[in-house]
Amino acid sequence: MTNDSEIVVEEKISGPISDWLSNNGFENIPLKEDHLGIEVIKISPNNLLTIVEALKNDGFNYLQCQGGYDEGPGLNIVCFYNLIEMNELKEDISPREVRLKVFLDRNGDLTVPSLYSLFRGADWQERETFDMYGVNFQGHPHPKRLLMPEDWKGWPLRKDYVQPDFYEMQDAY
């Protein structure tokens, strides 16, 4: 039983990377760490490129993964980025890691800056996120579908996607 007059104090969830970003003037919102204990940070699409560039300059030199997911009908489309500091480490030391998340209103502007200029490995990962969720990556050199046919309508991994009854494959000849 709880007393209504008790003040609930939330546990501080910011970690060293979020604190470093805040101390250097980068807007961010720390989220609860993931199941592996890795720091998760929410950032705005407008700050993505500058924050990732700052993190890369601070040693996060490898984009392990970029992807997206749909929180559900009427909710956000989320782009996530897993960055790692790849250095030669002693056997008992783990590399620094961080997870960045950009939350996009599904009915708003689904545009984020491409990280291709910083990490060439973002190429096909961003194209897959575009292909499956409809997120546009501004500045991407090859902004076209990767998995679905070029004339496909819609974004198949969105939870509000309605699958067509019939799709006629076009003969390449």
From Swiss-Prot:
Any one GO molecular-function label of the UniProt entry: quinone binding
Name the GO cellular-component terms. Answer: plasma membrane-derived thylakoid membrane
Keyword Flavoprotein belongs to the record? no
PROSITE patterns recorded for this chain?
Answer: COMPLEX1_30K (PS00542)
Catalytically driven reaction(s):
a plastoquinone + NADH + (n+1) H(+)(in) = a plastoquinol + NAD(+) + n H(+)(out); a plastoquinone + NADPH + (n+1) H(+)(in) = a plastoquinol + NADP(+) + n H(+)(out)
Cite the record's note on assembly. Answer: NDH-1 can be composed of about 15 different subunits; different subcomplexes with different compositions have been identified which probably have different functions.
Protein name per UniProt: NAD(P)H-quinone oxidoreductase subunit J
